[in-house]
Structures are given as C-alpha cells and as structure tokens.
C-alpha cells in the first residue's frame, strides 16, 4: 500500500502534467505539511513563476533557501537566493541574506555538501594505436 506522501506526490505530478497549476500548488502545500522538504518550496516557486506571480515565487525561493541554510546546505541556499535575485535584482533584502550566509560560513563549509562520485565511463570508441 502506498504511503500518503506517495499518493499526494502522484497527484502533484498529475496536476503538473495537465498544467493544472493551482491544483498542483494546493497538493504541494499538503505534501509540504507532511514532509518539510525545501525542494517542495522550490517547486511551488517554479509553479508560481509559471502563473506570473513573481513576488510569491520569490517568497517561496527565500523560504526554501532559509530551510536549506538551517539544514546546513549552504550552497543550495545560496543557489535559491540567486534564483530569487534573478527575479528581483534590486532586492536589498535578498542581497543581505546572501551576504549574511556567506559571512557566517567559512569557505570549507561552503564546499561540504556531498558530491556523488561516479567512476569515469570506459571509452568504447577509441582507436588503438600500435
């Protein structure tokens, strides 16, 4: 039996596939109430952008950035701040949040997020030289 989280996520995907943006936002809000994943806020911001609700999208991106920062994902938080800043380049609040995050975090901590290692794929179309 599927979990309630999975069921709601499937409903979200159905609404997104049909371009039912408002219904998708409603379901994503329900999903966020169950599981406070910052990526859900990012997706809500994306949908709000599609609806030309720039100010609401910025607020979603800022909320996601704050959640990422609280959890220690500084690089992801900075990326969300940059996304919000792209929508409103003159917003001093966003700039100050970014600067505070940078100042409170040493360079080593900015690079702490795990990077998935994948070994290089073998070259299959190489020509052997003798």
Residue ranges and their predicted role:
Residues 1-130:
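Repeat-based scaffolding regions
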């Amino acid at each position: 039996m599927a979990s309630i989280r999975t069921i709601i996520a499937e409903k979200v995907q159905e609404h997104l596939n049909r371009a039912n943006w408002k219904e998708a936002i409603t379901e994503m809000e329900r999903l966020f109430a169950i599981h406070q994943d910052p990526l859900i806020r990012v997706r809500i911001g994306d949908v709000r952008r599609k609806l030309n609700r720039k100010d609401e999208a910025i607020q979603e991106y800022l909320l996601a950035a704050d959640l990422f920062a609280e959890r220690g994902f500084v690089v992801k938080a900075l990326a969300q701040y940059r996304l919000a800043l792209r929508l409103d380049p003159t917003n001093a609040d966003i700039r100050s949040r970014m600067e505070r995050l940078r100042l409170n975090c040493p360079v080593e901590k900015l690079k702490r997020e795990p990077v998935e290692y994948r070994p290089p794929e073998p070259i299959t179309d190489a020509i052997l030289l003798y």
